[in-house]
């Protein structure tokens, strides 16, 4: 048995979709364990583009079991729409290939209303939420009033759950100048889709326990990145779930002993979507070039990503909090043609040099990057599949990142194509 967790080691958008797709060829089961449909994956397979947000990336590969774990908040309407979308692209989806945790919490239309109203009220201080109801759904989950997948099979329990929700949401919506919530309409909408959703529902913890006992290879697919973790990220400019690798266990129902390798993904530079501190941001021609060449626009939202140099301090911290075993470095080809490339090796804060990202919001905004400059390369790295295909300067760059982060590179991705990967160590081989 081997369990590999894939987590982003920056602010998300590190190319997890491609790497998970590549690793899924070695896996029997692919599991989503946190987040919702707020983080998109783009997969390019035989020239065909698949855009996923909620569904595990393993679905686009035949012969794999894909699982949505209990740690995910699920918009059931979006789930069904996304299933229909990839079915239209020729992908077979059935209860034999996709399983949904029966104890996963649901995202409701009310959650989206609240998300959008709160974000709009913040004005210039907006966090940058996708307004898809993720945060409010997690609030109801923690508040023990969430509607869960299993409740769709029990109309009597659904009535009680909706009454409990109404007691909380009525005054909340009134304070946000939102219309009175309609419990009857919500129940009718949920019961209408219940048969379709319940067809995929199972006790995922039990299913995965059986897979572990049989020695199956399980790939745990994280969403977002560690620096968006609700505890360890740039709070409050974070997501509403735990993104670190440790949550792969809690968010799927398997014990931590099932995890044998943690793969941390990082771009060869840095990007961020939405507001929040970003020490190495390049709000200039360099940032524009990175964004243009790297096609840095959100899969779900289309929002332009902020771009900057690689921040080894941040990635090292993300690796520490997630227990990363090895790195997968992506988008190395975007740096082709730069005469020089900078790497952040430390921060300056109030005149002192520090080697970590501080927890306080004021300090996070005040840190200044300390850079090391490396020579760039004029040759192309695009499509490289071995070290010998890389310009010498690119090899030096990758090796320097390994030194600064303190983790070896297991994989280097050199294009969006699935097979354009330099493999140093197969995570499933330990």
From Swiss-Prot:
GO biological process: 'de novo' AMP biosynthetic process; IMP metabolic process
InterPro entries from the UniProt entry: Adenylosuccin_syn_GTP-bd (IPR018220), Adenylosuccinate_synth_dom1 (IPR042109), Adenylosuccinate_synth_dom2 (IPR042110), Adenylosuccinate_synth_dom3 (IPR042111), Adenylosuccinate_synthetase (IPR001114), P-loop_NTPase (IPR027417)
Catalytic residues of the enzyme: 13, 41
Reactions catalysed according to its record: IMP + L-aspartate + GTP = N(6)-(1,2-dicarboxyethyl)-AMP + GDP + phosphate + 2 H(+)
UniProt pathway annotation: Purine metabolism; AMP biosynthesis via de novo pathway; AMP from IMP: step 1/2
TM stretches of this protein: none
Positions of substrate binding: 299-305
Protein name per UniProt: Adenylosuccinate synthetase
Lineage: Bacteria, Pseudomonadati, Pseudomonadota, Alphaproteobacteria, Hyphomonadales
Gene: purA
């Amino acid at each position: 048995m081997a369990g590999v967790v894939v987590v982003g080691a920056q602010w998300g958008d590190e190319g997890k979709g491609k790497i998970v797709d590549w690793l899924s060829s070695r896996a029997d089961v692919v599991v989503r364990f946190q987040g919702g449909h707020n983080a998109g994956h783009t997969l390019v397979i035989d020239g065909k583009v698949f855009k996923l947000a909620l569904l595990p990336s393993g679905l686009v590969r035949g012969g794999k079991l894909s699982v949505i774990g209990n740690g995910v908040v699920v918009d059931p309407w979006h789930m069904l729409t996304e299933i229909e979308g990839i079915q239209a692209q020729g992908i077979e989806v059935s209860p034999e290939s996709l399983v949904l945790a029966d104890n996963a919490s649901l995202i409701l239309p009310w959650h989206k209303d609240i998300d959008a109203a709160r974000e709009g009220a913040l004005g210039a201080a907006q966090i940058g939420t996708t307004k898809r109801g993720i945060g409010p759904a997690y609030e109801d989950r923690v508040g023990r009033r969430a509607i869960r997948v299993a409740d769709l099979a029990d109309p009597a329990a659904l009535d009680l759950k909706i009454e409990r929700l109404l007691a909380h949401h009525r005054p909340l919506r009134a304070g946000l100048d939102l219309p009175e919530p309609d419990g009857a309409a919500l129940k009718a909408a949920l019961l209408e889709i219940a048969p379709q959703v319940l067809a995929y529902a199972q006790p995922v913890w039990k299913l995965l326990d059986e897979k572990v006992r049989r020695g199956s290879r399980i790939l745990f697919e994280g969403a977002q990145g560690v620096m968006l973790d609700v505890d360890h990220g740039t709070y409050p400019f974070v997501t509403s779930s735990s993104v670190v690798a440790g949550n792969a266990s809690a968010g799927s129902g398997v014990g931590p002993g099932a995890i044998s390798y943690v793969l941390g993904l990082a771009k060869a530079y840095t990007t961020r979507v939405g507001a929040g501190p970003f020490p190495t941001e390049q709000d200039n021609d360099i940032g524009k070039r990175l964004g243009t060449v790297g096609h840095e626009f959100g899969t779900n939202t289309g929002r332009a990503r902020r771009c900057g140099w690689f921040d080894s301090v941040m990635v090292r911290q993300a690796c520490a909090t997630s227990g990363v075993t090895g790195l997968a470095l992506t988008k190395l080809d975007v740096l082709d043609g730069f005469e020089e490339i900078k790497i952040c090796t430390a921060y300056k804060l109030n005149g002192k040099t520090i080697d970590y990202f501080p927890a306080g919001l004021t300090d996070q905004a005040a840190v200044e990057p300390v850079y090391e400059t490396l020579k760039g390369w004029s040759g192309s790295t695009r499509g490289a599949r071995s070290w010998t295909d890389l310009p010498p300067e690119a090899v030096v760059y990758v090796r320097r990142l390994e030194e600064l982060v303190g983790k070896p590179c297991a994989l280097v991705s050199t294009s969006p194509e699935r097979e354009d990967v330099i493999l140093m160590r197969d995570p499933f081989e330990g």
